[in-house]
Structure formats: C-alpha cells, structure tokens
C-alpha cells in the first residue's frame, strides 16, 4: 500500500486541504501555503514512537482575522493498494479480519484512517483514532491502537531536517565501522552524506570527510543500482539506511515496510549536481517520497505527473496536479521535454502569457519594463508554445491552477490557434478574455506598420534606391543582420525615446487583461 490522499480540516496553518499523493510526489507553491503544517500532520501521526500522537491546543487552526481557534480538527489518511487483491497477503490479514478494506471503482481497495481532535466545553482536548467504512462511518474495533500501530509500522514517516534523525551515536558508528568492500564503502559514503547535510547536531561537523570523494562514491553506487536487476543491492542500501531511523518494538524493517520519506527543500543544502545524484539514489529505494522544493533544477528531473502545485486562498489551500487522462502520450512527451529543458521556472508562476515564438518573448518582456510592470513580482511568465503546442500547454496550465492568456499572429496559423483557445474555454467565457490576435501576419509586421518602420530600416542597413520600401524583405534582413533579442531591444529603446504613449494600444490592453487574470 501507499498513502494515496490526505484530507486536512482545521490543523495548524491549514483551514482546508485535499491532496492526492503518488509514490513519488514533489510539492511546489508560494510561501505560506501550509508546507510545515502538512509535513507535521504526516510526521506527527505516523511518528514511529510508542504512543499515538495526542493533539495539543497549538494544533487547532486559527482562522484569518479571528483570535480564537476552531474547536474541531480532522486528518483523514487514505491508503491504496499497489496491486489489486493485495488484501490476500498475509500482512494484511488484521485489516481484512476487521473489514477495513473498502472497494473502489478503480479496482484498488482503500484503507481509511481518521484522526480527530476536539476541544470540549471545559477546554480539554480529546484525540480519537478510527478506521472508516465505505459510508465514512467509524468501524467498531476493540484493538484500535494495535491496528493503528501496525499501520504506522508499515508506513513510518521520516522527515529529513527533523530532530528525530539527530542521533550522533549513529553518525559516529558510520565513520568508525569497518569497511569490508567497495560496495559497503559506497553505501557508507551515502550514509555519511545524509548525516552531514540533513542532521543539525553540533558534532556533525566532526565526522565530515572530503565530500567530493564521498559524492564520487555515491555516484558510483548510482551506476551499480541502475544495473541491479535482482534488486538485492537496493535492499542492502535500504536496510543500511534504516539504521539512521528510530527503532522501537513496533518498527521492524521488512519486505513489506514502506516508509514515507519527507525531503524538505533538499536544494537548500545541496549543489544542483549533488541534488541530481541524491535524487537518483533515493529513487531506487522502496519508499514513498514526498519532497518540497522551489528548485528549478530539481523540478527539471521530476515527471510532470509527480508535481503538485499548492495555492493558499482565504478559505482553503488548493492542490493542483496533472491527471493521467489530461494529456495523450505524444502531448505528454512534448510537454515534458519543453518544461524540463526550457520552462521549469514557469511552474512557479501563477500566470502564463503564451506566445508563438522567441520574438514575442523578447518584445513583451521589454514592453513590460517600459510600462514598469515587474512580471516576476506579479508571478507572470511569458512561455513560448511553438515546440510543445498550444493545446497541451493550456491543458497543463488549467490542471495546475495556472491562469493563461494567448498572443498570436494574424495569419492562418493564428486563426487556428484562436480555434484551439475557443475549444479550451469554459462556457460563457468571451474569447477576448483569453486571446489577442494581432491584426498583421506577425509581430514584426505589426510594429513596422505602426510607426516603427525606421527601426527595421536602420537595422537592415537598407539603402533606398527609390521611394519603394519592401516591408517583408526589410524585416527579414533586419532579423538576419542582428538577432531577435537585438530587435526587441532596438524597438524598446525607440519607444523609450518617444515615451510610453507610443506603445501600441493592443499591448497595453493585453497587459491589463493579464494583470486582471493574475489577480483573480
């Protein structure tokens, strides 16, 4: 099984949140979306300690603008089978015996654990654990604590950068233990690196070695893991790393144990190259991984379907991620390449301006500066769609909760893009709210006929032999003799000389609509 979903109501900094997890999940979002509260909900309940966690007053959410906390909070954990009919396995018999598995339409059974907290009239705090049936009602179970402990033992949560991993005697043993072979030496190097980068104990610096050599050993281990067809090496690494974790009578690392590892902003401590090595290493472990990050480098290594974007609103925290049905295989492949290699930073934006090519990217960027519009501060990103296609990008933006607006040329291709936008619009949404179609064949011709012909003539080094000026030929030569960025800067400089009133009205309206969408 793996953790499939978590519902949070009234816990710490989260008023409401419903989030779907996959075996490997990366969470991104602006500050204050509730990251610490979400990670705490996971690590406190599945804490691998001997006692079930009991809520305290600080766990109850205080709504915005109020001084009093809510009186009731709920955490609902949904676990899902990895394989159909997993309930037949020996290790699931206790859950089957109490009829805790619930059928689901997708054929994979679910297990629901609800943890509730309540403040009574005497200000006493009560915590209740229960398993739910298909109707959401608590299943009567006499040995509820024992069943909850068994679930925690299967899926203990370990939070890297967490004080519970701060165990200097483990670190000391790692350094002084006898190394028998190259493989054990490489595994030990990985363990030392984890201690060095993710433990915050004052004595950790005493155990560090040459980290360059350690990372080299970790990289060698990656190559061996990739060739490990029997998975024996993966298991050896897993059980070696298990020595870093808390041990008690309930936690026994076996073939059915699947810990949930929380990596909290690993990029904050690691160089991008080191992030890549560590990321590949942990991908071989039989764990469920949940990572928070603001790293473009890390995002570029993650499958699009594993990225979840979280946005906090006044009433709740919304989670957005790509569904398996949102894109076909070809669109997914093209979009993945485009995002990973060119536009990872765009995933951290709340608004996309989708344009056909490089020229539009440069010109719109320069126009925004002249209008004193800081696109980065506004969360706006200009994204070129020529490589991946317009429709997949709009689909992805909608799935991830990113607002979007399209700028296209006035040629046949532009009219086709207009039809794509029309199909993607929600009912009753005017086409003009999502797209601007230039009244000329492209943006260069638009500027040429709107008072900036002299810029193109100058850049083209055009020597007039008559009063005839072939517009298209001059534009082509201007681009050939300079570059698209240089053309954009030249137009920007000319507009700066004339004043912002010379910016064509169509672009002022475009930015006005974009800002309106970005602030909704």
PLM regions with names:
Residues 1-47, 222-343, 362, 516:
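Switch/communication elements of ASCE P-loop NTPase nucleotide-binding domains
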Residues 25, 79-83, 117-121:
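Beta-strand elements of well-folded, non-transmembrane domains
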Residues 40-104:
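Conserved P-loop NTP-binding catalytic core
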Residues 87-178:
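A sensor for short, sequence-defined functional sites
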Residues 124-130, 152-260:
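Extended helical coiled-coil dimerization/tether regions that scaffold
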Residues 299, 305-414:
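RecA-like P-loop NTPase motor core
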Residues 364, 369, 461-520:
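Charge-patterned, long linear interaction tracts outside catalytic cores
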Residues 418-490:
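Activity-critical C-terminal alpha-helical subdomain
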């Amino acid at each position: 099984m793996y953790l499939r979903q978590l519902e949070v109501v009234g816990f710490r900094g989260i008023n409401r949140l419903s989030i779907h997890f996959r075996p490997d999940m990366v969470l991104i979002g602006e500050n204050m979306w509730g990251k610490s509260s979400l990670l705490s909900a996971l690590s406190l309940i599945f804490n691998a300690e001997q006692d079930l966690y009991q809520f305290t007053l600080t766990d109850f959410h205080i709504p915005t603008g109020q001084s009093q906390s809510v009186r009731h909070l709920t955490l609902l954990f949904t676990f899902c089978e990895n394989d159909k009919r997993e309930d037949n396995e020996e290790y699931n018999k206790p859950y089957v015996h109490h009829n805790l598995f619930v059928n689901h339409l997708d054929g994979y059974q679910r297990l629901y654990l609800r943890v509730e907290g309540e403040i009574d009239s005497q200000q006493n705090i009560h915590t209740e654990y229960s398993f739910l049936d298909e109707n959401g009602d608590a299943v009567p179970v006499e040995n509820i604590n024992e069943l909850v402990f068994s679930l925690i033992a299967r899926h203990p949560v370990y939070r890297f950068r967490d004080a519970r991993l701060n165990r200097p005697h483990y670190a000391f043993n790692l350094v002084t233990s006898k190394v028998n072979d190259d493989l054990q030496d490489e595994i030990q190097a990985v363990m030392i690196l984890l201690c060095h980068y993710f433990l915050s104990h004052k004595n950790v610096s005493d155990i560090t070695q040459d980290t360059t050599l350690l990372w080299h050993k970790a990289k060698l281990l990656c190559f061996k893991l990739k060739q490990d067809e029997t998975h024996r090496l993966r298991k050896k690494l897993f059980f070696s790393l298990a020595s870093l974790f808390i041990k008690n009578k309930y936690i026994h690392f076996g073939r059915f144990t699947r810990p949930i590892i929380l990596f909290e902003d690993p990029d904050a401590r690691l160089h991008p190259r080191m992030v890549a090595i560590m990321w590949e290493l942990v991908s071989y472990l039989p764990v469920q991984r949940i990572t928070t990050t603001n790293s473009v480098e890390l995002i570029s290594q993650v499958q699009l379907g594993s990225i979840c974007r979280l946005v906090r609103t006044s009433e709740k925290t919304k989670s957005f991620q790509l569904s398996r049905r949102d894109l076909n295989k070809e669109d997914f492949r093209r979009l993945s390449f485009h995002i990973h290699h060119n536009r990872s930073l765009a995933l951290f934006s709340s608004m996309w301006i989708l344009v056909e090519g490089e020229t539009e990217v440069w010109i719109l960027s320069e126009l925004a500066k002249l209008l004193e519009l800081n696109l980065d501060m506004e969360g706006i990103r200009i994204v070129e769609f020529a490589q991946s296609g317009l429709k997949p990008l709009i689909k992805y933006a909608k799935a991830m909760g990113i607002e979007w607006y399209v700028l296209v040329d006035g040629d046949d291709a532009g009219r086709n893009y207009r039809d794509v936008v029309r199909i993607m619009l929600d009912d009753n949404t005017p086409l003009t709210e999502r797209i601007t179609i230039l009244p000329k064949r492209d943006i260069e011709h638009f500027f040429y006929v709107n008072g900036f012909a002299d810029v193109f003539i100058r850049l083209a080094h055009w020597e007039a032999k008559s009063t005839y000026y072939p517009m298209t030929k001059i534009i082509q030569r201007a681009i050939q003799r300079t570059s698209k960025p240089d053309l954009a800067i030249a137009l920007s400089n000319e507009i700066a000389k004339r004043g912002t009133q010379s910016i064509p009205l169509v672009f002022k309206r475009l930015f006005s609509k974009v800002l309106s969408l970005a602030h909704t």
